[in-house]
C-alpha cells in the first residue's frame, strides 16, 4: 500500500515538473498567418487556431492526473475498512479462522506466566537447599556438608518469605 502511494505521488510530481520545465522552454512566436518566410522563399501556412493546446496544457488532463490517484486510494482505504469490519471466517478462509490479536496476546501471557512459575519453583528449591545447608552448619555438622535425602524437607515447595529471612511466623 505504501509503495503504491509513493509511486503515484512520484509519477504525479515527475509529470508536473516535466510539464512546467518544457512548457517554459517553448517560445511563443507571433508569426503572421498566411505567408511565412522560409529561407529565400515564402511558405504558405495553414490556417491553424492561434492557441493550440498540447496534451501538457490541457487542464482536464491534469485534473485527471490528480483525481485518479485520489479515487484509487479512497477505494483501497474503504476496502481495508470493510475487511476489518467483516468477520474473519468470511475473508477468504472459510475453514480456518486466523488467530486474533487477543488470542496472540493471551498465548504470550500464558507463556510468560508458565516461565515465571518455573522460575519460582526453581528459586524455592534453591532457597530450600540453602536453608538446609544453613541448618546443617548451625547444628555443627560442618565437616559433612553433603545433605542426605532424610534431611530434605517433606515439602520443598512450601517455603514462605518468613522462612527465607529466618523469621518465625506467629501463627
From Swiss-Prot:
Residues 74-171 are cytoplasmic. It is found in: Nucleus inner membrane; Cytoplasmic vesicle, Secretory vesicle, Acrosome. It comes from the Eukaryota. GO terms for biological process: cell differentiation; spermatogenesis. Keywords: Cytoplasmic vesicle, Differentiation, Membrane, Nucleus, Signal, Spermatogenesis, Transmembrane, Transmembrane helix. Residues 1-19 form the signal peptide. It is a single-pass type I membrane protein. Its main location: nucleus. Belongs to the FAM209 family. This is Protein FAM209B. It comes from Homo sapiens (Human).
Amino acid at each position: 500500500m505504501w509503495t503504491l502511494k509513493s509511486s503515484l505521488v512520484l509519477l504525479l510530481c515527475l509529470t508536473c515538473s516535466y510539464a512546467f520545465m518544457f512548457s517554459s522552454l517553448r517560445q511563443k512566436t507571433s508569426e503572421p498567418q498566411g505567408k511565412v518566410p522560409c529561407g529565400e522563399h515564402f511558405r504558405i501556412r495553414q490556417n491553424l487556431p492561434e492557441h493550440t493546446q498540447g496534451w501538457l496544457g490541457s487542464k482536464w488532463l491534469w485534473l485527471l492526473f490528480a483525481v485518479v490517484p485520489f479515487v484509487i486510494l479512497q477505494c483501497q482505504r474503504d476496502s481495508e475498512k470493510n475487511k476489518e469490519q467483516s468477520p474473519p471466517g468470511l475473508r477468504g478462509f472459510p475453514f480456518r479462522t486466523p488467530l486474533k490479536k487477543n488470542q496472540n496476546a493471551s498465548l504470550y501471557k500464558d507463556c510468560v506466566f508458565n516461565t515465571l512459575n518455573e522460575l519460582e519453583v526453581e528459586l524455592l528449591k534453591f532457597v530450600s537447599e540453602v536453608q538446609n545447608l544453613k541448618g546443617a552448619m548451625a547444628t555443627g555438622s560442618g565437616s559433612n556438608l553433603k545433605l542426605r535425602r532424610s534431611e530434605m524437607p517433606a515439602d520443598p515447595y512450601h517455603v514462605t518469605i518468613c522462612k527465607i529471612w529466618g523469621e518465625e511466623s506467629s501463627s
